[in-house]
Amino acid sequence: MKKKNIILGVLAAGTAAAFTGAGAVFHNIIVRKKQEPTDIIVAPDAVNGAERKQLWTESNCWLNERGSEKVSIQSFDGLILRGEFFEGEGEPDSTVLLVHGYRCNRRREYAAIARFYLEAGYNVLLVDNRAHGESDGRYIGFGILDRE
């Protein structure tokens, strides 16, 4: 009887630990709370911290001065996904779509790259995926839920 109780106790503790771990993973990776923008993200070997911040600041100021059209679309599940459209110089016939990565937003990750494409004569569409930046949502879909 004592051995059976020990085995049941170990199984119960293991099950509780597994559920606790799964819940932590779900809430830390899938569920997204709205956050204020923090620091910029650029490849670590690209430039040092001061140069990175200066590049990000200059590029964002340049984009702000240039102006953009705020765009939005409603997803199949009713969320509003937001972005910015920048018109290139002259009459460009190509548009570059820049989609940020995990736990980022359109301006933080792609301000300098958007400037590069605009100066090269392309239209640029910067978007915020669901649960990122200005777009609605609490669950990160890694693009799967945004494809429709």
Predicted regions and their residues:
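Short beta-strand element of the alpha/beta-hydrolase
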Residues: 93-101
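Membrane-penetrating hydrophobic segments
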Residues: 1-14
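An N-terminal hydrophobic leader/cap segment in hydrolases
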Residues: 14-74
